[in-house]
């Protein structure tokens, strides 16, 4: 196996040597690929020049690696048969699992991470590395050299997994190795290691804190470009709570206990991790990692509390400000609204909380209903599930949104764009300018999401309104049909009643009741109300369609995307300059892009809020129409009940009339029904008794007529009996009905006699 810079391809059975993965002070790491199974492993071998002590510690490292089993520590593998024979020395090879994602340094060096990783990526990294360090410390192992180069990435089923490599057992820190080490790597070493003092597990706390700070901000916390000797003498002057020692563009060294901006953390995480970093970056090892709540070495438990936070992110659409709230599993939505009122001044009853799809939060569910697992997305999106806050007391939304404050160095070049800066200063400040333009674009996108959430909510309300409109129109048609039928029926009844009054039954009370029914149904129908509401809803529908057709109502890219891409390209070209061309330069071009981005942001925000105001007006109209439609539907329901009740009453009256009519035909009846009146019906036997007195004096034809009359008399008697039986049965079935509103039978007889 050759360790020269240009590797010659070697094979060992089915295994084929691939590229070099890394080169360290003690040897190289090479990727090997099994051509039959597709398996890949990383083989590490140390150089021959190791001292006897380091050779012994190297063998010890291999033994320890083989017994470690943890998802965040690179696992040892068996060295393929025959591969040890390819080694140029007698030191054993170390076979490890191969992680395809490369190391963390490569990840941090990506352009988009120049101002720190995304929030989701930071949280997963902190979780993984803390878990690995805990495991190592529980096994009485101190890493001592934790840095981005010693953390590799492996893509898991749901997210990236971070694994610690190079446990550092073969490293001997003497004065010579410190002087020849790369400047940057020494800053991850705890001060007591640099001072060659006794150390404990707290050396890993310092390294972890430095690593975490760099992942959050994009740069190391303490004078990253200084030489070791000057660095040590200056940084040791910091207070116990200082987590940043930086040099501004004027060369002034500043100490700070605050997490610097820009970074991609929300306000709650930034505050909590700032306090946690103060524990991890204490200069004195005995105090380092001591948490006020959990005591010595309590930093891991304190970090657990941070990682387990459940956060709700509320974007106040009135001000454009994001408010983040830690919530418990059982915290109610009402409790969250009370906290929102304290921060925003918007009363609870006026707060409307919408998710991105336009769905309102459900009052009976806990506040955690809008939280998803943000750790799974690795920060590739905006990293948070936003809930959009609207003030229902507002009819229109004014543009009150301003760009976020710029970092100090960016503000400096905005004032002096022609000022020449050193290359390392340009690299940092240009990265911050690009990040500022990215932030403007993301803030604009969030506001656009809020406007679209309001639009989606409007469409949901409009859909509900449309369904109610269709139901109202259908009910109106059905009611109209019933009313028309009833009016026609009552009109026919009145006409027929009028026709028979001369020879039939009359009742002023019945006539009055029918007239009152006719007047009562004239008040039913609600046709005018329905017509007016339909017209208003159609006008609203037109406004909503216009909103949807408007270019402002659709998600769009535009100038901010173009400016962000131009800034990225400028930054990329700066970083990729050859070392001999990394000279001083000004920032005029970057400043021009930033100023254009700010102008574009302000213009887009005005457009978004114009659209939002129109959306709110339409929603207000929809909300005003909903109860009116419900009221008309309710009134039509009552009208329908009224029509049914009147129809039932009318039917009962008709049956009562039939009863009265039947009671008048109990005696024999002669002649046609059309020729009978009440007085004649009252003397059914009178006609039949008259012909018998002169029957003997009649001629033969007259006798036959008399026989026919007698026969008719008998038939009338039979009919009278049948009618009486029928009336008796009807009397029994009608006894349960309330007939108090009609006249009694005696009153009816009296009226009939008077009429005759």
Curated annotation (Swiss-Prot):
It is linked to Immunodeficiency 15B: An autosomal recessive primary immunodeficiency disorder characterized by onset in infancy of life-threatening bacterial, fungal, and viral infections and failure to thrive. Laboratory studies show hypo- or agammaglobulinemia with relatively normal numbers of B and T-cells, and impaired differentiation and activation of immune cells. Pfam families: IKBKB_SDD, IKKbetaNEMObind, Pkinase. The active site is at residue 145. Residues 458-479 are annotated as: Leucine-zipper. The lineage of its organism: Eukaryota, Metazoa, Chordata, Craniata, Vertebrata. PROSITE patterns: PROTEIN_KINASE_DOM, PROTEIN_KINASE_ST. Residues 15-300 form the Protein kinase domain. The modification Hydroxyproline is found at residue 191. The keyword Plastid does not apply. SUPFAM superfamilies: Protein kinase-like (PK-like), Ubiquitin-like. It comes from Homo sapiens (Human). The gene is IKBKB. It comes from the Eukaryota. Its EC number is 2.7.11.10, 2.7.11.1. The kinase domain is located in the N-terminal region. The leucine zipper is important to allow homo- and hetero-dimerization. At the C-terminal region is located the region responsible for the interaction with NEMO/IKBKG. The modification Phosphoserine is found at residues 177, 181, 670, 672, 675, 682, 689, 692, 695, 697, 705, 733, 740, 750. This is Inhibitor of nuclear factor kappa-B kinase subunit beta. Its main location: cytoplasm.
């Amino acid at each position: 196996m050759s360790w020269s810079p240009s590797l010659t391809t070697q094979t060992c059975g089915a295994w084929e040597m691939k590229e070099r993965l890394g080169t360290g002070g003690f040897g190289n790491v090479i990727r090997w690929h099994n051509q039959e199974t597709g398996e890949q492993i990383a083989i590490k071998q140390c150089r021959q020049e190791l001292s006897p002590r380091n050779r012994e510690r190297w063998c010890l490292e291999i033994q320890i690696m083989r017994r470690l089993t943890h998802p965040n520590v690179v696992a040892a593998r068996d060295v393929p048969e025959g591969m040890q024979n390819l080694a140029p020395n007698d030191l054993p090879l170390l076979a490890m699992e191969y992680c395809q994602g490369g190391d963390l340094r490569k990840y941090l060096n990506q352009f988009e991470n120049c101002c720190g990783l995304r929030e989701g990526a930071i949280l997963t990294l902190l979780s993984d590395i803390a878990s690995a360090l805990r495991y190592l410390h529980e096994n009485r192992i101190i890493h001592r050299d934790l840095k981005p180069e010693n953390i590799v990435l492996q893509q898991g089923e749901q997210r990236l997994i971070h694994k610690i490599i190079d446990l550092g057992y073969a490293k001997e820190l003497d004065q010579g190795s410190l002087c020849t080490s790369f400047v940057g790597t020494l800053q991850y070493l705890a001060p007591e290691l640099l001072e060659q003092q006794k150390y404990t597990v707290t050396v890993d706390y310092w390294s972890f804190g430095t690593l975490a700070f760099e992942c959050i901000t994009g740069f190391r916390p303490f004078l990253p470009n200084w030489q070791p000797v000057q660095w040590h003498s200056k940084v040791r002057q910091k207070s116990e709570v200082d987590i940043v020692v930086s040099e501004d563009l004027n060369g002034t060294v500043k100490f700070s206990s605050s997490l610097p901006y820009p970074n991609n953390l929300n306000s709650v995480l930034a505050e909590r991790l700032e306090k946690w970093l103060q524990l991890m970056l204490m200069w004195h090892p005995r105090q380092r990692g001591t948490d006020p709540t959990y005591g010595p070495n309590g930093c891991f438990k304190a970090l657990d509390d941070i990682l387990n936070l459940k956060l709700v992110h509320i974007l106040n659409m009135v001000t454009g400000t994001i408010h983040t709230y830690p919530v418990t599993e059982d915290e109610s939505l009402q409790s969250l609204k009370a906290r929102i009122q304290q921060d925003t001044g918007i009363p609870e009853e006026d707060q409307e909380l919408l998710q991105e799809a336009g769905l309102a939060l459900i009052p009976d569910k806990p506040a955690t209903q809008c939280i998803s697992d943000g750790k799974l997305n690795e920060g590739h999106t905006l990293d948070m599930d936003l809930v959009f806050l609207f003030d229902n007391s507002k009819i229109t939304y004014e543009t009150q949104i301003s760009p976020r404050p710029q970092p100090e160095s960016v503000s400096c070049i905005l004032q002096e764009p022609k000022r020449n800066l050193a290359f390392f200063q340009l690299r940092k400040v240009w990265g911050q300018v690009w990040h500022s333009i990215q932030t403007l674009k993301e803030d604009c996108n969030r506001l656009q999401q809020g406007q679209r959430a309001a639009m989606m909510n409007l469409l949901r309300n409009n859909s509900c309104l449309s369904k109610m409109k269709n139901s109202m129109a259908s009910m109106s048609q059905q009611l109209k049909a019933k009313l028309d039928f009833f009016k026609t029926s009552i009109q026919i009844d009145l006409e027929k009643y009028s026709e028979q009054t001369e020879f039939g039954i009359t009742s002023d009370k019945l006539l009055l009741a029918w007239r009152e029914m006719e007047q009562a149904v004239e008040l039913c129908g609600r046709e005018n109300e329905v017509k007016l509401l339909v017209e208003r809803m159609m006008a609203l529908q037109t406004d909503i369609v216009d909103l949807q057709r408007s270019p402002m109502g659709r998600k769009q890219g535009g100038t901010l995307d173009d400016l962000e891409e131009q800034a990225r390209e400028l930054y990329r070209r700066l970083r990729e300059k050859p070392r001999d061309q990394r000279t001083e330069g000004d920032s005029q071009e970057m400043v021009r892009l930033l100023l254009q981005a700010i102008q574009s942001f302000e213009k887009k925000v005005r457009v978004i809020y114009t659209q939002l105001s129109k959306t709110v007006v339409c929603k207000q109209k929809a909300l005003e129409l909903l109860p009116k439609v419900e009221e008309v539907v309710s009134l039509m329901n009552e009208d329908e009940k009224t029509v049914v009740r009147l129809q039932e009453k009318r039917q009962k009256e008709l049956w009562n009339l039939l009863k009265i009519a039947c009671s008048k035909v109990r005696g024999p009846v002669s002649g046609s029904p059309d020729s009978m009146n009440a007085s004649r019906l009252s003397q059914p036997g009178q006609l039949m008794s008259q012909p018998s007195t002169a029957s003997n004096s009649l001629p033969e034809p007259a006798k036959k007529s008399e026989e026919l009359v007698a026969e008719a008399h008998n038939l009338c008697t039979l009919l009278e009996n049948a009618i009486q039986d029928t009336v008796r049965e009807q009397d029994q079935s009608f006894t349960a009905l309330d007939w108090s509103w009609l006249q009694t039978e005696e009153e009816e007889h009296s009226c009939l006699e008077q009429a005759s």
